[in-house]
Each structure stands twice: as C-alpha cells, then as structure tokens.
C-alpha cells in the first residue's frame, strides 16, 4: 500500500501499528507516509497527531511539532506525551530550565512518574546543577534499585559536590538490598581507591568479581590498584583476565 500509493481504509490503530513498525525499522519516510495517510482518514486521532509531532522532532522541525502539541493540549490538557515531547523540544534547543518546568507540571497529574523524574534529573545534570539533580535520581533508585544508570549519575553528582561520605552511604544502602550488586561494589571500590583505602578497594573489587566473574571493569580496576602498590604479578594476572574476557569468543 505505502510503496504503491494504493489507498485502503484502515482503522486508526492499524495506521499506528504500521507507523510504529517503520519507526522501529528506522524507515522514517514510510512512517511519515503511513501517518499522513492515517491522518487523512482519521484527522482527529490524537495518537496519530503525536506520532506526527514525534517524527517532526526527530527531523528537527520543532516549530511544526510544537504547533501540533499545542493543538493536542487544547483537546487533552493532561496528555502525558504532549508534556514529554515539549520537554524534548526545549532540551534539544538547550532550554533545560523550560524543560524542567514543563516536566514538573506533568508530575502534578501523571501517575507513572519514573521517566519524568529521570528526565528532570538529566536536565539538571546538563545545567551542572548537581544538587538539584540528586533528589530526582534518588527517586528513580527508590522506585527501582536495579536502575544502575541512575546510580552512576547519582554518584557522579555526589563526586562533583565532594560528597564522598554520601556516595559511600548510598552505595552501602544499595548493597544492603542487593549484596551481589556488582555495580555498587565496583563503584565503592573506586571511591576507596581514591581515598587511599587500598585493602577496602581490593576487597570491593573482589566482591564485584564474585558477583559476576565476567565483569571486566572489576578486573581492570583491581589490577590498577595492585600495580600501584607494587603487586605486579597479581596486577598482570588481572589485566590478563580482563583481556581474555574482552575477546569476542570468551565465555
């Protein structure tokens, strides 16, 4: 149909599914065509309008996308996607404060807040406002203690603020809930190393390796510490293991 320009009537959900299919395949020209045909048949369908604005944002046509989003907002003032897309437009135009404002507005009526917390935190990170980012990354971690990207970002914020004790406390809290968290052991090991607490650092990297014996970064960090204190043979062995595990056919 899309390749021959033959037009058939489809339900709006069919056009939405077809559009998502082509977007997932990164075939945006056919996705645009499907959305246009869908809107020709279902001009008032909000989901198709939002797919259209999403593609316009992808193509950097921000003004056109914003017009659509304003129109949808008039029809559906509490549409979650409208707020997320508007925030994306602001962010892409280096207007992080405006993005944060609109995301905070969305928090007042949206039940599923996780994505919004993360988006707000990332905008604060772009502004290098680490102190403001911290509570939102903490909310993400409280919701999902396996959200390691938020954990990395939270520790990054603490380190930039010189809040080392808070970093250790946060990682220790994660380890209380998940004692085999290789990421938490790895991160706390790096902190101990920076503090010159060599024995604690090595122990932490050992626990990271116990948690996952394929965890290359733990072997590398442990090797660096061992090299620093002159335990060269052990350092070389850990470097060797990290190289071996990094090879394509390693198991």
Where are these regions (language model features)?
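Start-of-helix register in tetratricopeptide repeats
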Residues: 13, 47, 81, 115, ...
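Structural marker of alpha-solenoid helical repeat scaffolds
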Residues: 41, 74-76, 108-110, 143, ...
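Register position in tetratricopeptide repeats
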Residues: 24, 58, 92-93, 126-127, ...
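Canonical positions in the second alpha-helix
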Residues: 38, 71-72, 105-106, 139-140, ...
